[in-house]
Amino acid sequence: MKHTFKAIIITVMCTVFSTNGIAQIDHWEKLVGENDTWQYRVGNSEPSSSWMNTSFNSSSWSSGTGGIGYGDGDDSTVITNCASLYMRRSFTVSNLNAIEALILHADYDDGFVAYLNGTEIARANVDTLTPPYNYDPPTWREAKMYQGGEAVTFVVNKAIWQGLLTNGTNILAVHTINHSGANSSDMSARYWLHCGVTTATQIHAAPAAWFDFDCFESPVAILRINTFEETIPDDPSIRGIMEIVWNDTATNHATYDVASDLITNIEIEKRGRWSQFVYPKNGYAIETKDFHWEDTDVSPLNMPMEEDWT
């Protein structure tokens, strides 16, 4: 049986209006930029298991300006062909209490896992918990920005980052992984970390020139769907992440708020010929998936458990 979502706003990753129980973001700032100087290690062997932690000593690693990679002409630091790449960037937070949201942007080829102070905050095209240096991502993926596209937006779960981010020095660490290993003809590793600030005073660097996040609040649930900057086709379905922002005790919900109701992998495609060719707003068929991309039942907004949704 298929169920239909009701009263959910679908957002596309700005201006904030209205506040009602949610700290209002005044503006956005950049904590980490792709063209910062990163420490990096070419992944042709396994690193220390603590490489992403704040206590790890990376003084023996190479350093270079991001993005880092080879083969696409979008790399400030060019490296040799490799199976994967490990990167670390330290940054300073000056007023933690003023930060309301974190957004990670990633332009990558082919998969990645990102860590904040040693804890995972985002991943794409990786379906194993801790990928080894020679892990092979499930699918091939090309970077977008050098082709005129956009970086992928990841809203970092506040329930996670709030317990990680500290005043003073922090570490963003990213493992970027090639499909087909060192035989791959290219690799792209470009990452940014932005924060939404509630005060009018600028504390950190200005956001990237292209930064744009659709900020608003809603009295009904907000549905975030991330297809990693891939266009949703008629067929076949593509992979993505679906999140629902909803709290029974809140009167308003923000697009950058905690996805406390649901976070799940999905496969999504356009649904119905009328949706594609007649109506300006498309209908979609969604199948929910577990960590390993197997079918899984979910119960969004206390609806009956199901894996197929429209």
Regions of interest found by a model, annotated:
Residues M187-T310:
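Phosphate-handling architecture centered on phosphoinositide signaling
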Residues D127, T139-F211:
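An acidic-aromatic loop/edge-strand motif
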Residues Q24-S55, D212-P219:
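GGW-centered surface loops in extracellular recognition modules
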Residues R88-A98, A159-G163:
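Extracellular and analogous surface-interaction loops
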Residues W38, W61, F91, N97-G118, ...:
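Aromatic-lined ligand-binding clefts that engage carbohydrates, nucleic acids, or primary amines
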Residues M1-I9, C14:
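Bacterial N-terminal signal peptides that target proteins for export
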Residues T54-S90:
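Surface-exposed, low-complexity/disordered Ser/Thr/Gly/Pro/Asn-rich loops and linkers
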